[in-house]
Each structure stands twice: as structure tokens, then as C-alpha cells.
Regions:
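Terminal low-complexity/IDR "tail" segments
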Residues: 88-89, 221
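Catalytic cores of glycan-processing enzymes that make or break glycosidic bonds
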Residues: 101-131, 178-181, 211-894
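Residues in well-ordered beta-strands of folded domains
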Residues: 6, 20, 60, 80, ...
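Aromatic-rich carbohydrate-binding modules that target alpha-glucans
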Residues: 2, 8-52, 62-83, 138-186, ...
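Boundary detector for helix-to-coil junctions that initiate low-complexity/charged tails
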Residues: 91-95, 100
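Generic secondary-structure microfeatures
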Residues: 9, 23, 136-138, 149-151, ...
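Structural beta-strand segments of beta-rich domains
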Residues: 1-5, 128-132
């Protein structure tokens, strides 16, 4: 069988069009360079080496043997070879870029919101055939695409006689016709949607009739036409949902923390109230110290392993020891009655249960076919993870650089830990056992969500722990001598220092970002949508020196630093030592330290000349100061410590980390002492430089940096892609997100336009997620009472009310705010569970301050918030649930 592929593409001189046939083995492709005589029409022939019934493929553009462009990879072309007698296929394709409605092709829609059963196309026994294919992603559950056209075979424009097409791929429909039954080589037709509830009332596609002129065919020929996408007069889909961490869930069955069983129960509540999305926070293992400090869900020790705290013990076999079962039940009731999570006791108890269960059931489970299948599919990450956990516990620290041995993971260890006959295997197999059950339960929750047509939305953290598996096993991918964070923003005036290592993108890009692709594909096993945490990090990351505590001394990496001559070109007389070393004068010390100024002069700084000082070598970095004040918690000690931090960051420029001859203006330095000491004309010159650097100079550069990375990542899976694009957002972020069809995050109290106090919800882009608050923010009720002047302005200018704003926030007003968000044009309106609860004064938690999940300004925050109601109680609140459903229905959301 020969396949002749044809495609029109206007190439420029030196470019070639390449056919890439996917083999089904990872990302392997077979390439065929196509031929052309006019630079516009390209063709090539391909003869499959083995008997195949289906081919998936895409086209790309190459120059000098290097790919410079390719089609949208999420939905490659699909050719079903359904004509049994065909000896030659003639295929007419068209180039497919990422469509404007790419979200409809995501698994969030095809598997959840508009799930339909796809069928294998039937074989055709025609001597000559024509296959028509069209993409029609707007169809809803239960609907069918019908081809209706001229001639008897196409139904003579009679809907009842139209040809029902087969959905052979997600949102792509096909039909194979017998050419001998056609009355004319000219086909004229249109597509229509048939809803089984209204079978005689078709919805016709937009536009004129379609026409296809068949070429001269001979027996054994099959011609295939890939047609342009069909569009129908349907409003864009809009969905509502809830955001809540899994650890915050509470049910009658919980063991002091939300688990994967509770996730199923929460899916029930979401579905029962007309919501279609449930968003959670990261669920990967974060066990570093074994203390409550591990409660931070964004500092995972593995990008694959799930956190053991989420295991639902009720889904596991019971312990044979009934006395121990009774003891665990007593402890479960006690922990579940607490208003917040006791992270340490919960995790200790769950591991005790799992250890005992492993002794009882482990040997049999590890021999089962189900486990062997799981192990074979996951051993590449599972074995290093188990080894890391084993050595972490053996040596009493996750800092592998401090281990007396095994500071690197060897292939020999991998082999030994993969072989069930070795002693090492038996030592680490407990972790295989735990991850097997976690994976099984999370898969079960995902399948349950699909059955309820609820989209599970996950969260991809921007960073990884420097004391984790990936840093241990794959250090080449990371810059372990730096720290990732964020510049100052509404969450933290000193910036944020997350402590994560930054990525070595040169190495990652060299292998096609395989590390990221595998990470996303693993996540797609559990979720159908995801949030990219801090998407700005793919443009540039805020990189902080390893010896810094706060984020103020960071710089964007990569970015275009400034030379001394460039700085002078803005009218600022650059003086390297003065402007790159901490500016410490007598008046600065007096203002910062007040009654402690004398102590600081005597102990922590030394005089350089006149009234100018420098830090003593023992305290000249923030990490040294941190170590000196470790364990000192008095108000005076904290005053001095934080004051020393501020002295060290009081510089006008920071040196480029890679090129010491380049400089970056220190972020937010306009609020610091060295800026205050400048002459007015120098301040003006610096501000010109500062604004150009942060908002214009790097825009094109950062755009190209993001486009090296993000296209590969967002096309690695079919999950719906959303991004957290808050903070210091350069213009290029919107360019990339629009180009890649990534949903933005819109928060009315944090508008993208810096000239506005509040965003206009009616101007939200459709491709966006609208929310009131995130886990890093005050809840709606907290925010309402934090700044009376601000909320009065909101009450008057946004809610259009002329009287005084009521405090605390009444339920009726919370309902109006929720309604406004639901009515926005945003595709998704996802509200925190706390903000949903704010509409009911009887049900909501009396203490609004107890609803806060995280305080970003506090790097040692304890993440322990839990629902104050059980999910079972929530399901029984019929009036509240009816109100939620009414608000959603009135907004027109599905």
C-alpha cells in the first residue's frame, strides 16, 4: 500500500516541509522530506513497512536540516486506513496551527465537560472511496455530527437521510464514501449537529456550502480530504468550580487530614451544585524534616511521588490485630475533631499504620501482577524516590550533601533496588508499597471525577526542593548555587525567597525538555487541567544569591544586564563601589535601629570614613546574620536582625551573577536609604533607567526565552492549561499566553493595569480564570475588613452603592460579589471554598481569620487549614447548595 501525502504551504527559499510519522514509541518519528515544484504544493510518498490500520503524523518546516516550525502537536493528523481494497491512498491535508478554541480539544472538555464515546471506524469494502474528515469541537455530550449534501448518497439535503459520521479521534469526525455511488465528482455538502433530544432540528454549521471536486480515480484508489474546522452558532462554554487543597477536606471518615477518599466526596458536592471544576493544590510528597515545616505543598521532594498523608486508610485492608485497629480508630476520631491539621501526629499515625500493613500484606502485594505492572511503568522515578526516602531516614536528614555515603545515586544501586531478590530491594520496597496504593487511589478519584463530568485541576509548582530526589539524581538540570523567589509584590515587601534551586535551561533545552515533558505526562494521569505556578518563571526567574535571606538582592535570570557606560548613558554618574556596596551612614543606623544604634555600631559594622560604615566580615551576608541570631526570638533581637538584613540589601545595583561587568538596578530600591541619599536629578535618571530595564529593555528577550520552553511543555499533554500570571508582569507574558492559548488568572483586587485599583470583571478575557482570592491571599471576608477605606471605595465604585460599606461582610453582599464574578466573560470562575461559604452567614466559619491558608510573607507558615464542616454536613445543607446552584445557573455557566 502506498500513501501519497499532499499539503499546501508557502515556504520561503531554503525551507523544506517534512512529514513526521509518529511511531507510538515515546516521541519517536519517521521523517520524510517532501517535494515541491512551486514552493507551495508539497507531496511525498510513504509505504508502511508493516501492516498498519492507523497513522498519526504532523508536518514541520526545516531549514538546513533543523526544525524551525511545526504544527500543533496536541492533535496530530490521524489517518484511518479503512478501505480494505485500497492499494493507494491520496491524502490532501492542510497545515494546522494551534486553534483559537484549542481548549475544546483538551481532556477537560473531551473527557469531562463534553465527553462522548469515540468509535473505531468500520472497514469499507469499496473499490474506490473518498474519506472526509473534519474537526468539530463544539459538540456536546450525546450529540452527533451529520453530513448532508447533494445527491442520493449524501441525502439530497434531507436531514433524516444525512450520513452520521464517526468520531474517530477527539473532536474529529470522519466518514468513508463509496465513489461508485456518487452521481457527480463534485460534492456539495454541509455539516450539522444532531441532538438526540431534537433529532429533526439540526444545527447547521456557519458559512457557505462546502465543495470538493474529486480527482480522476482508478480501482484501488482511496482519496482522503482533511477539511477545515466546522463552526456552529453556539455560545462559548463557561464553567464554575471550587478551589480547595486536598489536605483541607474534612469528612466523617478522615484521619485528621483530607485524603483521596475525601476527594471523591468533594467531587460529589461539586457535581451536585452544578459546578464542573475542582481545583486542588500540589499533592506530591514534601517530607524533608518530618515536622510541620513539611506542610508547605510547593516544596516537593519528588515531582512524581504522592504525599503519603493523602492515603485513605479506609480503602486499605484492615489490620489483623483488632486491638491495633481500635487504637487507630480512637486516634483517628481525636485527630479528626481538631479544628486544624496536626501535621506531625497525622503523618506519624498514617506511617505507623502503613508499616504494620506492609508487614502483613506487603509480601503478597509485591508478587501480584497489578503491582508488577505499576512498578514496570514507574520504576524510573520510583526507585530513586524510594532510595532517597531510605537514606533520608537512615541518616536523619534529607540534605544529601551531608550524608556520609550515597551522595550520588549509582546505576548499581538502581539495579539492586529493582531486583526483588536483593537485600536492598527489601529495605526500600515499603516505599513502593505506599506509592502503589497512593497511585491507585488517586487514579480512582480521577476516574470518579470523569464519571461525574467534573474536571480535576492540579497545580504544577515552579520549583523543586534542593533537598529532594531530582536535585540528588539529576543535578545537571539545576543551579544549586542560587535560589528562586519573587520580587516584592502585594504579598511581601521584601520579596519572596522560596529556596528552590533555579533551572539550568541550557541543559534542559538540549534534550527537548524531557524532564518537564515526563513531569507533565505523569500529572495528566491524575488531572485534566492544571495551573502553572508562577508562569513568569518560564520567561525569567527571580534568582537570589545563596547567601541572601530576603528577595531584594535578586535579579531576573536570564536578563540583559547593563554596563557602566549604559548606566551613565541615562544621566546617572555610576560609581561602582558606592552603588553596589551597602550604603550605611550614621543617619541610616539611627533611623533603622533607634535605641539599638550603639550596639550595632559596636558589634556589627565598622567605620570606613567620616560617617560611612560597612558590615563586619562576620555579618556581611544575610545568611551570616541569620546564623548569628538563630534561636533568638525576643522583640529586640528580631528588630536588630531584620535591621541588619535591611542594611545589607541597601544597594542601588546588584552585579550580574554570570558577568561581573554588568549590573541590574536593585528591585524596589526607591523605598531604600541609598535612593533617598541621591540628588533629585540622579533620582530622575535612575527612575528612567529602572523603568526601562524592568518594563521595556527585556521584553523581546524574555518573549523568546519563553517560546523556547513553553510550546513544548503545554503541548506535551491534552490537559487544559491555566497560568498564575500575577506579580511583576512584563508585556511579553500576554503575547506568549495569547499565542499559546493559555488561560490567564484574573483577580479583581489585583488588576493587571497598574493604573486601576479594581479590575473591571466585564473586561476579563474569555481565555481566563476569574477568582476572588487565592490560597496566598486573604479570603473575601478577611480582605473586606483589612482596609475600610479600600472596601468603601469598592462598595461605591464597583458595587454601585451609595451608603456606607457594612462590616463585617454580610452574606447578601458576598452573594452579589460572587454573582458578579460568575457573570464575567471568563471561561472558568473558580472560587475558594471559603469564598463560596461567605454567602451564608449561618454556615460560614465565625472567625474569618481562621480561613487563611497561606501568608507568603512568612516563609515558615504552617499550612494546616481545614474545612469547619464535614463534606457529609455540607451535602445536607440543601438551602445553601440550592443557592450555589442558582447563582451558577443564572450566570449561564454549564
Amino acid at each position: 500500500m502506498k500513501l501519497r501525502f499532499n499539503i499546501d504551504y508557502r515556504a520561503v527559499y531554503g525551507e523544506n516541509i517534512v512529514l513526521n510519522i509518529l511511531t507510538g514509541r515515546d516521541d519517536e518519528v519517521r521523517k520524510r522530506v517532501m517535494n515541491t515544484i512551486d514552493g507551495n504544493t508539497w507531496r511525498c510518498e510513504y509505504e508502511p513497512s508493516e501492516k498498519v490500520s492507523r497513522l498519526d503524523y504532523f508536518y514541520s518546516v526545516e531549514r538546513d536540516g533543523r526544525e524551525v516550525r511545526h504544527e500543533w502537536l496536541v492533535m496530530p493528523h490521524r489517518l484511518d486506513l479503512t478501505s480494505r481494497s485500497a492499494k493507494r491512498y491520496i491524502i490532501f491535508d492542510h497545515w494546522i496551527d494551534i486553534p483559537e478554541d484549542s481548549y475544546l480539544y483538551s481532556s477537560a472538555f473531551t473527557n469531562c465537560v463534553a465527553s462522548r464515546k469515540r468509535l473505531e471506524p468500520k472497514d469499507a469494502k469499496y473499490t474506490m472511496s473518498v474519506q472526509l474528515k473534519v474537526r468539530a469541537p463544539q459538540l456536546r455530550t450525546g450529540e452527533t455530527l451529520v453530513l448532508i449534501g447533494n445527491g442520493r448518497l449524501l441525502g439530497d439535503w434531507d436531514v433524516a437521510r444525512g450520513i452520521h459520521m464517526t468520531e474517530h479521534n477527539y473532536d474529529e469526525w470522519m466518514v468513508t464514501l463509496d465513489v461508485s455511488q456518487l452521481s457527480s465528482p463534485l460534492l456539495e455538502f454541509k455539516f450539522a449537529i444532531i441532538n438526540p433530544a431534537r433529532p429533526t432540528t439540526p444545527m447547521w454549521e456557519n458559512g457557505d456550502n462546502r465543495h470538493v471536486m474529486l480527482p480522476m480515480l482508478k480501482p484501488g484508489d482511496a482519496v482522503v480530504y482533511e477539511l477545515s474546522q466546522a463552526y456552529f452558532p453556539l455560545p462559548p462554554a463557561k464553567l464554575a468550580g471550587t478551589v480547595i487543597p486536598i489536605f483541607s477536606l474534612r469528612s466523617e471518615h478522615s484521619f485528621g487530614v483530607g485524603d483521596f477518599g475525601d476527594l471523591k466526596r468533594m467531587i460529589d458536592w461539586v457535581a451536585s451544585t452544578g459546578q464542573r471544576v475542582l481545583q486542588v493544590l500540589p499533592i506530591n510528597d514534601t517530607t524533608i524534616t518530618g515536622t510541620w515545616q513539611d506542610s508547605y505543598p510547593y516544596n516537593s521532594i519528588s515531582i512524581y511521588a504522592l504525599h503519603p498523608q493523602y492515603i485513605d486508610l479506609n480503602q486499605l485492608p484492615a489490620l489483623a490485630d483488632k486491638k491495633r485497629m481500635a487504637e487507630f480508630e480512637t486516634l483517628r476520631v481525636e485527630l479528626n475533631a481538631l479544628p486544624q491539621i496536626d501535621y506531625e501526629r497525622v503523618n506519624k499515625a498514617k506511617h505507623e499504620y502503613l508499616r504494620e500493613l506492609y508487614k502483613q500484606e506487603g509480601a503478597e502485594l509485591l508478587k501480584s501482577d497489578e503491582f508488577k505492572e505499576f512498578f514496570a511503568a514507574n520504576k524510573d522515578w520510583l526507585v530513586p524516590y524510594a532510595a532517597f526516602c531510605h537514606y533520608r531516614d537512615e541518616y536523619g536528614t534529607a540534605s544529601f550533601g551531608q550524608w556520609p555515603d550515597h551522595r550520588t545515586f549509582t546505576p548499581e544501586e538502581f539495579d539492586a533496588m529493582s531486583n526483588a531478590r536483593t537485600k536492598l530491594y527489601k529495605e526500600v520496597a515499603y516505599w513502593y508499597f505506599v506509592q502503589f496504593y497512593l497511585d491507585k487511589q488517586m487514579h480512582g478519584a480521577h476516574e470518579y471525577a470523569l464519571s461525574k463530568r467534573v474536571v480535576l485541576k492540579g497545580d504544577i509548582p515552579i520549583g523543586i526542593s534542593r533537598d529532594g530526589v531530582e536535585a540528588w539524581v539529576e543535578p545537571k538540570y539545576f543551579n544549586l548555587n542560587g535560589q528562586a523567589g519573587a520580587p516584592p509584590d502585594a504579598f511581601s515587601t521584601n520579596g519572596q525567597n522560596w529556596g528552590f534551586p533555579t533551572y539550568n535551561w541550557d541543559v534542559m533545552l538540549a534534550d527537548g525538555c524531557s524532564w518537564w515533558v515526563k513531569r507533565f505526562r505523569k500529572m495528566a494521569q491524575y488531572f485534566d487541567a492544571y495551573r502553572i505556578d508562577h508562569v513568569l518563571g518560564f520567561f525569567r526567574i527571580w534568582e537570589i544569591p545563596i547567601d541572601a535571606v530576603h528577595g531584594l538582592l535578586g535579579q531576573f535570570s536570564p536578563s540583559l544586564g547593563m554596563s557602566a557606560d549604559e548606566i551613565r548613558g541615562y544621566g546617572l554618574n555610576f560609581q561602582e563601589e558606592l552603588m553596589t556596596q551597602p550604603f550605611i551612614a550614621d543617619w541610616v543606623i539611627d533611623r533603622v535601629f533607634g535605641p539599638h544604634a550603639g550596639l550595632v555600631r559596636d558589634r556589627y559594622v565598622e567605620r570606613v570614613h567620616d560617617d560611612i560604615y560597612r558590615m563586619r566580615p562576620a555579618y556581611d551576608t544575610q545568611r551570616k546574620v541569620e546564623a548569628a541570631f538563630a534561636g533568638k526570638t525576643s522583640d529586640d533581637d528580631i528588630w536588630v536582625r531584620d535591621g541588619l538584613y535591611s542594611l545589607i540589601s541597601d544597594v542601588l545595583f546588584v552585579r550580574d551573577r554570570k558577568n561581573p561587568g554588568l549590573y541590574h538596578p536593585r528591585i524596589s530600591v526607591q523605598h531604600d536609604f541609598i535612593y533617598e541619599a541621591l540628588y533629585d536629578n540622579d533620582k530622575q535618571a535612575f527612575n528612567r533607567l529602572y523603568n526601562d530595564y524592568y518594563y521595556r529593555r527585556n521584553n523581546d528577550f524574555w518573549y523568546h526565552e519563553a517560546m523556547k520552553k513553553l510550546p513544548k511543555l503545554v503541548q506535551a499533554t491534552r490537559m487544559l492549561v491555566c497560568a498564575e500570571d500575577l506579580g511583576m508582569v512584563p508585556d511579553c507574558v500576554a503575547w506568549v499566553m495569547n499565542e499559546l492559548r493559555i488561560l490567564s488568572l484574573e483577580i479583581q483586587s489585583m488588576p493587571k493595569d497598574p493604573k486601576l485599583t479594581f479590575g473591571n470583571l466585564n473586561l476579563n478575557p474569555y481565555r481566563s480564570v476569574s477568582t476572588i482570592s487565592t490560597h496566598d491571599m486573604s479570603t473575601l471576608r478577611q480582605w473586606w475588613d483589612e482596609d475600610y477605606e479600600l472596601t468603601q471605595q469598592y462598595y461605591n465604585s464597583v458595587m454601585w452603592r451609595g451608603d456606607g460599606a457594612p462590616h463585617p461582610l454580610p452574606g447578601w453582599l458576598a452573594s452579589d460579589i460572587v454573582r458578579n464574578h460568575l457573570n464575567s466573560p471568563s471561561m472558568l470562575c473558580l472560587l475558594s471554598w471559603q469564598d463560596w461559604m461567605s454567602i451564608d452567614e449561618k454556615l460560614r466559619l465565625p472567625d474569618a481569620n481562621a480561613e487563611r491558608i497561606n501568608i507568603p510573607a512568612n516563609p515558615r507558615h504552617y499550612w494546616r487549614y481545614r474545612m469547619h464542616l464535614t463534606i457529609e454536613q455540607l451535602m445536607q445543607e440543601s438551602a445553601f447548595n440550592a443557592k450555589v446552584q442558582e447563582l451558577i445557573n443564572q450566570s449561564g455557566r454549564l
